[in-house]
């Protein structure tokens, strides 16, 4: 009897009671899954000379990765996976502003770590493809496996607009999916529909710079490549492109949130919502599981 109870007791000691800590762990794992699968698809295509992957397979893998990542952490952290979406959730009141920098830090750290995992996984393939010469530009460049870079014709102004518009479309779509006063999505299928949204964006807006739309997805891997052997050119390439996929998605998230709220959400009839959205349900469940003292601490945070 003692032996059968031991695993349960151990699990009880390991269980984390803090809501914020659980959210951080779930967000870290979700971003890690997203990045490893997305970068793996790109690495497979690039290092094989596109004999084992292409433009379509990269975006398909990325959309499926988003779906899986949301299932991983959706009911714990909300599976934001993206500082731009976290910002949108703060704007609409679904995430406390005080948690925004914490979410962003976790997302950046996870993207950095996932890039390291991708590098280790494809280390031999990278060495074979490049001959040990890791470059940011040129016919054998491999930096784009990890971070995004603009097409040769793309100006910074057009690239900035690309990211504002693309992220705005992303946020409009996500808010519509989560809006129970609108058409809505059957419970549990939200991740699938979000994956379809990502695929549509990739296939329609991916040519200019690969639709980063996510500051953590771009900056975390870029920092990794800087320290892993690609050097400072990861920041100077594309006329100093690096800041565009960091700043523009945040602008796009603000624009997209304001657009959906002003044109759709604000005009719903007054009254209770038909059903709780994924994030609200998660918070309610967390409150029921969290002791009163922990809830007080959460409020202070």
UniProtKB/Swiss-Prot annotation:
Q: Which gene encodes it?
A: AQP10
Annotated motif NPA 1: location in the chain?
82-84
Q: What is its main location?
A: membrane
Give the sugar-modified residues. 128, 133
The protein's location, in the record's own words, is: Apical cell membrane; Cell membrane; Lipid droplet
Known regulation of activity? Glycerol transport is regulated by pH, with the porin being permeable to glycerol at pH 5.5 but not at pH 7.4. Water permeability, however, is not influenced by pH.
Protein known as: Aquaporin-10
Q: What is the effect of changing residue 77 to A/D?
A: Decreased glycerol channel activity
Record's GO cellular component, any one?
lipid droplet
Q: What is known of its domains?
A: Aquaporins contain two tandem repeats each containing three membrane-spanning domains and a pore-forming loop with the signature motif Asn-Pro-Ala (NPA).
Give the record's subunit note: Homotetramer; each monomer provides an independent glycerol/water pore.
Q: What else is known?
A: In vitro, it can transport the dietary compounds erythritol and xylitol.
Provide the catalytic activity annotation.
glycerol(in) = glycerol(out); H2O(in) = H2O(out); urea(in) = urea(out)
Q: Which organism is it from?
A: Homo sapiens (Human)
Q: How is it modified after translation?
A: N-glycosylation at Asn-133 increases the stability of the protein but has no effect on its activity.
One Pfam family hit: MIP
What keywords are assigned to this protein?
Answer: Cell membrane, Glycoprotein, Lipid droplet, Membrane, Repeat, Transmembrane, Transmembrane helix, Transport
Question: How does the UniProt record describe the way this protein sits in the membrane?
Answer: Multi-pass membrane protein
